[in-house]
Swiss-Prot record:
Organism: Cereibacter sphaeroides (Rhodobacter sphaeroides)
Ranges that cross the membrane: 251-269
Stated role: Component of the ubiquinol-cytochrome c reductase complex (complex III or cytochrome b-c1 complex), which is a respiratory chain that generates an electrochemical potential coupled to ATP synthesis. c1 functions as an electron donor to cytochrome c.
Keyword Nucleus appears in the UniProt entry: no
Taxonomic classification: Bacteria, Pseudomonadati, Pseudomonadota, Alphaproteobacteria, Rhodobacterales
Annotated InterPro entries: Cyt_c-like_dom, Cyt_c-like_dom_sf, Cyt_c1
Protein name (Swiss-Prot/TrEMBL): Cytochrome c1
Post-translational modification remark: Binds 1 heme c group covalently per subunit.
Top-level lineage group: Bacteria
PROSITE patterns found in the cross-reference section: CYTC (PS51007)
Keywords: Cell membrane, Electron transport, Heme, Iron, Membrane, Metal-binding, Respiratory chain, Signal, Transmembrane, Transmembrane helix, Transport
Amino acid sequence: MIRKLTLTAATALALSGGAAMAAGGGHVEDVPFSFEGPFGTFDQHQLQRGLQVYTEVCAACHGMKFVPIRSLSEPGGPELPEDQVRAYATQFTVTDEETGEDREGKPTDHFPHSALENAADLSLMAKARAGFHGPMGTGISQLFNGIGGPEYIYSVLTGFPEEPPKCAEGHEPDGFYYNRAFQNGSVPDTCKDANGVKTTAGSWIAMPPPLMDDLVEYADGHDASVHAMAEDVSAFLMWAAEPKLMARKQAGFTAVMFLTVLSVLLYLTNKRLWAGVKGKKKTNV
């Protein structure tokens, strides 16, 4: 019975995985971010650059309504000086909940909502999107590489080729742009097989390519290529979704070290308490 259930489950998994592979999932790059792994940390300068890209490019459409502006000065993040955070907040206009009047933003306010109704909020985007899925539709890859949210964002931002797939020539959806990583957009019928399954990676997205080389000018003179800016803003959005990530890692490391020391002490104590008993031989009365 157990063997039959196992075979049935394996068959279902293979079929669902095969369907997912045949559907032409989006292509996601594996980016070696500094914060990955148990000992990884956010790069403060990268987060500051990512904030600049978000402010000058992404914020025109996308909001981050769950992120308080004051968190920009907190440890583990961009760590901007408090005077810079206050100055940064003033560029936003918010509606005071008590008076109902518009006023300049304060560090205690949150980032604004998305400017467009159909523009996704980016507060939790790095946690809401999965870039890695593993073979045959399983989550094995996520066990080793993580969910891959930042990689997904990076891949979408850099996934606009100069030419669309040949199957779409002359049949591209109006007002949409082909993206190798975006999976849930529209696909012309010419890029589908007889069963209606798309035959190309990615799909068409309403967002035009948001980045181009040297679109922003970094104060530290860092490279401002499309790939560099995409990596910076992806890291920043990961921090926005997980602002306490470094603190959690530190707490986890401390807990592991404490439990390790405690285990050693308990082992030595147990050995000492039972040393006199375990060393004696039983005698027949």
